[in-house]
């Protein structure tokens, strides 16, 4: 197996899911500390400098510049160590299989149902016949988002160690927790990180490039009702769960994730629970246009007010928090044009045409770019993320390490 494949499989086996229910603590899960220590140990073994793991499971390290290139700006890369919480993620049993075409059964899920991928679910498989794929065994997610990105970066450093003749500026590396629950690397010490600009590696298929993300907010709707014996409830009972249902019905049904694509925004009901006396619904709202996000916020506030007026009591309350912003607002500034053009050139050097897509999500760069680390998003080469059908093609995993080598070499020259 190649170095990057070995590392990827090893990282996948370390469970490190984040948990939105404990998001008030960073990291939200103890397992992310364990993943951070695994990555830090690999960095130290390779000879990276200034390797630090802080109390929040942030890993920061540096790779020194080639001789004569010490005065160039530091190039930064960032990946996240957590995996998604929406699917089972412990234990993870990655497997390497050769795709022979048609339907590929990878295993069975925890209820015994067949788990497979096919050209019907993933048309990209048509050109992957004969390739090795890293898949799940059907019982969990894989974790390519974002452990493929981590493996690529660490493997790149291993290449520099083995081939010191390869030229590169000083490189800063950050591996951060809780990306999947919207934390957005909020506690990354950018002064210690020390990068002038750079990239996150958290995208999908090989060649994908993103400088546009959603603007994002989370919305917490709370209902406080009044429980009365159902036999004598007339004119008295206020059912908190019913109030939440009325509220949800006022949101446009066509603007849900399952009905949207491209630049369409949406409202997403993440979870709901409750009873007569108390109920809650947690939403996220997403849109590439911040003005539309603001309109969505107002619609939810107005919907709650309407329900309260109908009931005749202040049953519903709405709490809104911004999560991240569209990184295009920063990356498209003329002084950062090199982030796009150098990525395009590096992809071409490995025979891939770069595809720019509006990302229907966010990356750590969505916050970091606004905090002073302008960064666009590169491929991590995973497909069907966050579920049991997730897979990573080995040729793409290996090809991205080559792409990163070419990309870094382009930064051995001053940028305009």
Language-model-detected regions and their locations in the chain:
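N-terminal capping segment at the start of a domain
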Residues: 2-29, 134-135, 227, 383-387
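A non-catalytic alpha/beta surface segment that caps or lines the substrate-entry region
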Residues: 23-72, 76-78, 82, 93
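Short, conserved micro-motifs enriched in small and acidic residues
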Residues: 30, 140-151, 234-242, 391-398
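Active-site metal-coordination/substrate-binding segment of hydrolases
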Residues: 69-170, 175
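Glycine/charged-rich beta-loop-alpha catalytic/anionic-binding loops adjacent to active sites
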Residues: 125-140, 224-228, 350, 382-386
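Acidic/histidine-rich catalytic neighborhood of metal-dependent amide-processing enzymes
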Residues: 125-213, 254-270, 274, 281-288, ...
């Amino acid at each position: 197996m190649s170095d990057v494949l070995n590392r990827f499989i090893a990282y996948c086996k370390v469970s490190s899911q984040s948990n939105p229910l404990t998001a008030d603590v960073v990291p939200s899960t103890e397992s992310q500390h364990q993943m951070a220590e695994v990555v830090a140990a690999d960095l130290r073994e390779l000879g990276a400098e200034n390797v630090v793991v802080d109390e929040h499971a942030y890993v920061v390290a540096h790779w020194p510049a080639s001789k004569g290139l010490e005065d160039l700006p530091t190039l930064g890369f960032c990946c996240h160590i957590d995996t998604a919480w929406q699917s089972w993620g412990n234990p993870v049993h990655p497997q390497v299989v050769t795709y022979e075409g048609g339907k590929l059964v990878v295993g069975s899920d925890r209820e015994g149902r067949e788990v497979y991928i096919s050209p019907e679910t993933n048309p990209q498989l048509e050109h992957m016949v004969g390739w090795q794929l890293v898949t799940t065994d059907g019982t969990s997610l894989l974790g390519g988002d974002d452990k493929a990105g981590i493996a690529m970066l660490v493997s790149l450093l291993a290449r520099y160690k083995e081939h010191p003749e390869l030229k590169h500026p000083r490189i800063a590396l950050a591996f951060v927790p809780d990306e999947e629950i919207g934390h957005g690397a909020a506690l990354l010490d950018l002064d210690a990180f020390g990068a002038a600009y750079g990239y996150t590696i958290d995208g999908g298929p090989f060649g994908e490039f993103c400088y546009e993300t959603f603007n994002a907010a989370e919305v917490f709707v709370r209902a406080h009702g009044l429980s009365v014996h159902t036999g004598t409830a007339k004119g008295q009972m206020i059912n908190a769960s019913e109030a939440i249902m009325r509220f949800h019905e006022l949101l446009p049904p066509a603007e849900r994730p399952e009905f949207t694509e491209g630049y369409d925004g949406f409202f997403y009901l993440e979870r709901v629970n409750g009873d007569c006396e108390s109920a809650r619904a947690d939403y996220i709202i997403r849109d590439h246009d911040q003005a539309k996000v603001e309109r969505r916020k107002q619609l939810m506030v107005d919907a709650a007010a309407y329900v309260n007026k109908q009931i005749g009591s202040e049953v519903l309350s709405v709490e809104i928090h911004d999560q991240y912003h569209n990184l295009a607002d920063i990356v498209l500034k003329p002084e950062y044009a090199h982030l796009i053009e150098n990525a395009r050139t590096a992809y071409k050097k490995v025979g891939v045409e770069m595809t720019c897509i509006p990302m229907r999500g966010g990356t750590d760069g969505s916050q970091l770019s606004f905090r002073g680390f302008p960064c666009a998003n590169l491929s991590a080469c995973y497909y069907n993320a966050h579920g049991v059908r997730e897979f990573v093609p080995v040729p793409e995993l290996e090809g991205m390490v080559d792409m990163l080598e070419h990309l870094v070499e382009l930064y051995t020259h001053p940028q305009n």
